[in-house]
Amino acid sequence: MSEAIKTDVLIIGAGPCGLFAVFELGLLDMKVHLVDILDKIGGQCAELYPEKPIYDIPGIPFVTGQGLTEALLEQIKPFNPNFHLNEMVESIEKIGDPGFRVTTDAGKVFECKIVVVSAGGGSFQPKRPPVPGIEAYENTSVFYAVRKMEQFRDREILIVGGGDSALDWTLNLHPLAKRITLLHRRDDFRAAPHSVEQMRKLVADGKMDLKIGQVTALEGADGQLSGAQVKGSDNAMSTVSCDTMLPFFGLTMKLGPVANWGLQLENNLVPVETASFETNVPGIFAIGDINTYPGKLKLILSGFHEGALMAQKAHRYVYPDKRLVFQYTTSSSSLQKKLGVN
């Protein structure tokens, strides 16, 4: 087990509600780390609708999901939060009163006084391609995310998909890989035009391969891939030599390991009391779309409100002997100093 990272608060989920919670906690002098299963900050806003307009953020008539994420990151910059992306929390163990030990699927361990679950509707899980026996190669030759690029140096990689993730990793891994083949079911891509243009230039220059078709079977033994059988658009069969496959077929929402954390659940949501949005486990809070209570509205602005009240209660756990004096950022010189505006 790796040495534990110690922090006041661990937030699970780096979407808008989790990001704004950093701001509210930071104003009250609490140190925060955030863990997210995605490879980017912003949650659903960044992953599902980065360019989609949002019209119901107070005081902002129009903003995109990406724009909101960038604004929140700028707002919390004074508090220097630490992000741990591409990691999923697997277990939460109570070790004090308050106090928790949290472990991720990457083997990282956190020790914190407070846990805030801000995981949207659960965790994003990669969609598995409908290829027989693919499970035998997962995490040895088949990967659904790139955590360390160096891991793929000198590999013969088959990247499957036609969206931004497939194109981005094709371009990013190209300098490291022995050879890259991009496979998509049609010669039409849903990625940024500039990325598609770069990819086609690499193909034209003979620096990578592009195939149109679908994987029907994998070849290899003992978890080590040696090739993939591909059915082309003309139904012709061929074999692509590869020792690594990266399928990017999008993500699906699942409750995931939240169900194993000892939290009360109601229709796959976490019930909370509305004074502080604490769960049935003292010291664990739930904000945003993951929680439920009478009158709940699944709106970003509701999650912001929940984060503000959560921080007030969290302060009592982190600083049990310190009296909390409520202050306004408009008039408090100490808060303005923390924000770097004084």
UniProtKB/Swiss-Prot annotation:
Name the Gene Ontology molecular function terms of this record: ferredoxin-NADP+ reductase activity; flavin adenine dinucleotide binding; NADP binding
Which residues are involved in binding FAD?
Answer: C17, D36, Q44, Y49, V89, F124, D289, T330
Catalyzed reaction equations: 2 reduced [2Fe-2S]-[ferredoxin] + NADP(+) + H(+) = 2 oxidized [2Fe-2S]-[ferredoxin] + NADPH
Gene3D superfamilies registered for this protein in UniProt: FAD/NAD(P)-binding domain
Q: Which domain of life is it from?
A: Bacteria
Which coenzyme or cofactor does it need? FAD
- Enzyme Commission code: 1.18.1.2
Record keyword NADP present: yes
What is the free-text note on the cofactor?
A: Binds 1 FAD per subunit.
Paired cysteines (S-S): none
Q: Per its UniProt entry, what is the enzyme's top EC class, as one word?
A: oxidoreductase
InterPro entries from the entry? FAD/NAD-bd_sf, FAD/NAD-binding_dom, Fd--NADP_Rdtase_type_2, Ferredoxin-NADP_redctase_2
Family designation? Belongs to the ferredoxin--NADP reductase type 2 family.
Q: What is this protein called?
A: Ferredoxin--NADP reductase
